[in-house]
Amino acid sequence: MFWVISKQGSTAVAEQEETLVFRVPTEDDGKAIWNLINYPGVLDLLSSYSYFMWAKFFDQTSVVGETNEQIVGFYIGLHTTEYGPDTLFYLASCSDETQRQKGLASRMLQAILHRYAWRNIRYLEATVGTSNEAPEALFQKLSRDLKTAYHVTEFFTEDQFPGKGHEDERLFKIGPFQQV
């Protein structure tokens, strides 16, 4: 496996005859991101408009992974000084079922951390529903790879959500870590 990081923020990874390209999303990716998150049917689906807006206004804290010019994964994140100047918070992520168990999510997060603009980031955070086990393994592995701490705390309880059917959300936090 090898990484190529361009000045535009794209990272290419070649592995077993399949090339994955990690790049900054554009507003043109909104539809593909919406389609990807809509397909599994297990994640909270927001309006398509929100994915267009995230890809446009949170592009530098987000990443799409593509192979054969098809988006196969994404992370949408935000960085605000109000929340914490050294923390990236991830709002949404998804990987195509053909890419699961291949380390795509971890590599997308590492691609973001390798971007020159985010070298002052020392923490990653995300909220995850209690039944979604894959992110826990991802954050544990990423914290081991980055040789840093890993914490999980209660964030929102089911009772806080309107209506029925939304489970508790946990806050995953890794860090502090040194520059990647």
From Swiss-Prot:
Which pathway is recorded for this entry? Amine and polyamine biosynthesis; ectoine biosynthesis; L-ectoine from L-aspartate 4-semialdehyde: step 2/3
For whether the record's keyword set contains Amino-acid biosynthesis, the answer is no
Q: Report the transmembrane regions from the record.
A: none
State which Enzyme Commission number(s) the record gives. Answer: 2.3.1.178
The superkingdom listed in its UniProt entry is Bacteria
Q: What class of enzyme is it?
A: transferase
Disulfide links within the chain: none
What biological process terms from GO does the record include? ectoine biosynthetic process
Family as reported in the entry's similarity comment? Belongs to the acetyltransferase family. EctA subfamily.
Full protein name: L-2,4-diaminobutyric acid acetyltransferase
Taxon lineage: Bacteria, Bacillati, Bacillota, Bacilli, Bacillales
